[in-house]
Amino acid sequence: MDHYFDSMVADFVKKDFSDIGVDTRDLRKNITEMTKEAYHDAKPETCVLCKVPGKKFCNSHTIPQFVLRTIAQDGKLLDWNAILKSPVVDKEKGMKQAETFKIICTECDKKEFAEYENPSNYDGPVTQKMMQEITLKNLLNPYSKAIKDKKLFTSLLNASEHLLDSPLANLMFESLSVAYIKEKIKATETDIKDYTRQIHILYHGKPDQYDVIWKYRLNYTAPIAFQGEINLVTGFNHELINNIYDYDEKNKLKPIELCVFPFLNQTYILLFLAKRDRHLYRKFIKKFSKIDVNGKMKVILLIIFLYSDTFLVSPLLAEEVSKNPKVQKTFSILPDFAGGIPHGVEDVSMYVSQQAVKEYDLNSYQDVPDFLSEQYSIEHLKADDTENL
């Protein structure tokens, strides 16, 4: 589920429905079961890469397992729900559930990502092959989620049409907005088509050449891990880079690829993009290159917090993250404009894009906590934890 939808559901299940005879615990359980059922049914028939029938699907990790093991505590990790304190989704994840997907076979999982998932390869220059593998992996997880979300939102829409006489259903869909659900179905359909096209090009066609924007090695283990593609809406100059609220198939989003990989006693940060898209990010790259290292790390965190729900956090950092008002403020943005267009606006697309540029502006990076600094490293957090025993 996306930031906005999960927040709406979380707010909904916190309400008291005792006056209509509904137990909130049962409601939470029903929503969770509906989500799990929809997600379970949303599976491809064959591996989306090799297309060979009959092969067993692999429980693939978006972030390499050697990275996850570095920051896990007793095999556990925390995701963004730990920050939002969502009552709907489990906050703590085991290694087997940490940002995984099941849409490719075991053979493809082992073969197609072998170079970038080898930690020794990060001591030298990042190769085109490594960046190609990262880009492919970055497409597979959101592709899997788009398939699941389409199934979930379709189930919700069907429920809204068949439960019109239910007081609870009326309250629920008044809160969640049927218009929003329909818009999300349209968006996921567009995403699925676009991901399918991109995966086909990367796996079967001629892949892009990539340019590294920033590669940096920290001499300590950061407590946050991330790997994903980011469709930056804007940078530091109020320019529109990607209009993520234009669901027209002709609107092709141009992402940057971002990795934060904690290793033992070191952390690698990698930011790159397709060479053909560099001109779109010219202003962002120019400003980013002039920011000092500490500032760059804050920009990286702000981008992750604003755009993604797939980063993972060491339990050692849990209290700092969940109680930090600056993080809460960042997550409170969650821009989504379904049903929120002021009366009289004629050009809705332009209005939404202008609002998005304001909300996603990166100039507030200085307000982001220093969670990638040595102060919050795994080494320091473990030392502090030992002292408090």
Segments and roles (model prediction):
Residues 76-181:
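Internal, well-ordered alpha/beta segment that forms a basic, Gly-enriched binding/recognition surface
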Residues 47-50, 135, 226, 269-271:
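Generic structural hydrophobic/aromatic packing signal, biased to beta-strands
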Residues 184-389:
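Charge-dense, low-complexity intrinsically disordered regions
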Residues 69-76, 80-81, 117-118, 143-156, ...:
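Generic detector of ordered, mature protein regions
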Residues 2-124:
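An N-terminal structural lobe/cap that precedes and organizes the functional/catalytic core
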Residues 2, 6, 124, 129-132, ...:
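Intrinsic-disorder-associated interaction segments
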Residues 14, 18, 22, 136, ...:
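Generic surface-pattern signal
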